[in-house]
């Protein structure tokens, strides 16, 4: 079995048209630098509420799928605006030559991302959709 090296890992990101909807085939993904990621999906089991099938309880049913985890990314000039847009929503932009982007908090709907972490040495690729940025630490 191949061994994955971090230097060869890749992170691709694209904004989704609506929450959980995969970007279309013509959407360009950005290749982003990252330090580490622990994104992963989990689907637990919940008790089945069906009654009337005898004394034995029914088998549990699947709960909703959750994608959780942390991602460490560097603060760089090229991609910092993308992370601000994911955290605060689309900016208000003014200017034709000298652009000025203003980000504000409190927007009712925030964008979601489709992220793909790739380990080409194995090869293994993990896609997570509906990813939203919760917080940023500097």
Question: Predicted segments — roles?
Answer:
Residues 1-138:
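Signature of extracytoplasmic/envelope-associated structural regions
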């Amino acid at each position: 079995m191949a061994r994955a090296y971090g230097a060869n890992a890749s992170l691709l990101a694209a904004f989704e048209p609506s929450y959980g909807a995969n970007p279309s085939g013509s959407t360009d993904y950005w290749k982003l630098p990252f330090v580490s990621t622990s994104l992963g999906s989990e689907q637990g089991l919940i008790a089945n509420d069906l009654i009337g099938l005898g004394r034995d309880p029914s088998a549990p049913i699947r709960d909703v799928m959750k994608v959780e985890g942390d991602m460490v990314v560097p603060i760089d000039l090229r991609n910092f605006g993308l992370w601000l847009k994911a955290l605060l929503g689309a900016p208000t932009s003014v200017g034709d030559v000298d652009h000025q982007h203003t980000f504000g908090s409190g927007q009712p709907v925030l964008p979601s991302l489709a992220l793909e972490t790739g380990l080409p040495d194995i090869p293994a690729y993990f896609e997570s959709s509906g990813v939203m940025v919760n917080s940023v630490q500097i």
